[in-house]
């Protein structure tokens, strides 16, 4: 079994995350940059973008999420929501992944035959970059979980960090030290997902 496949198998969703991180912020930043830069994109569009948050900026993001969800959540359910958000806030950092939409539009104009496909291909590219970053963090000893509070937080995030208008928020990858166990992976039967022909 290749080391790459072992890394894929080892990647899990860790929800109990902390600050006992051995890597420096610079090392983590380099790891994330390398993972995103070396992730393939259709037509070499390189449309994924990443904003890396540590410290106060990381905590600010989850304060924004909590504030955005409060008016949208029934009062009796909000304590559970607060507890969930607190678990993300307690982590070490967050990577926000964005799709750069001008690149997608330009490619649609250049290659009209495939115009309808470019938005889907851009989402695939974002997924690849996100999964590679997640796996790289896990291989470096950090746990992570993936959240999707967009578009509820889009405007507040853009204002707080001066995000360009052509960057569309797609996900939030929360990471930190592994402070608990991950749940067991469950898989559908292979015959539901794969077909092989000769």
Question: Model-flagged regions — what are they?
Answer:
Residues 1-93, 197-198:
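N-terminal amphipathic, basic helical "cap/leader" segment at the start of enzyme domains
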Residues 45-48, 139, 143, 170:
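Short secondary-structure junction motifs
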Residues 90, 95, 175-177:
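C-terminal edge-of-domain segments
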Residues 36, 111-159:
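Small-aliphatic-rich amphipathic alpha-helix that forms the alpha element of a beta-alpha
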Residues 3-16, 169-198:
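C-terminal helix-cap and adjacent tail motif
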Residues 98-103:
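Short glycine-enriched loops at secondary-structure junctions
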Residues 158-165, 182-186:
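Short proline/glycine-enriched turn/loop segments at secondary-structure junctions
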Residues 65, 107-112:
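Short, flexible, mixed-charge acidic loops at enzyme active sites
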């Amino acid at each position: 079994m290749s080391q790459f496949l072992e890394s894929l198998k080892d990647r899990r969703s860790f929800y109990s995350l902390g600050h006992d991180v051995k890597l420096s912020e610079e090392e983590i930043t380099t790891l994330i940059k390398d993972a995103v830069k070396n992730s393939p994109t259709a037509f070499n569009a390189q449309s994924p973008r990443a904003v890396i948050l540590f410290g106060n900026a990381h905590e600010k993001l989850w304060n924004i999420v909590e504030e955005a969800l409060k008016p949208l959540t029934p009062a009796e359910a909000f304590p559970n929501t607060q507890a969930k958000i607190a678990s993300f806030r307690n982590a070490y950092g967050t990577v926000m992944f964005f799709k750069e939409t001008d690149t997608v539009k330009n490619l649609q104009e250049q290659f009209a035959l495939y115009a309808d496909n470019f938005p889907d291909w851009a989402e695939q590219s974002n997924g690849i970059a996100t999964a590679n970053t997640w796996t790289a963090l896990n291989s470096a000893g950090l746990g992570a979980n993936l959240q999707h509070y967009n578009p509820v937080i889009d405007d507040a995030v853009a204002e707080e960090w001066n995000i360009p208008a052509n960057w569309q928020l797609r996900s939030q990858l929360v990471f930190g030290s592994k402070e608990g166990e991950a749940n067991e992976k469950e898989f559908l039967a292979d015959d539901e997902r794969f077909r092989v022909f000769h």
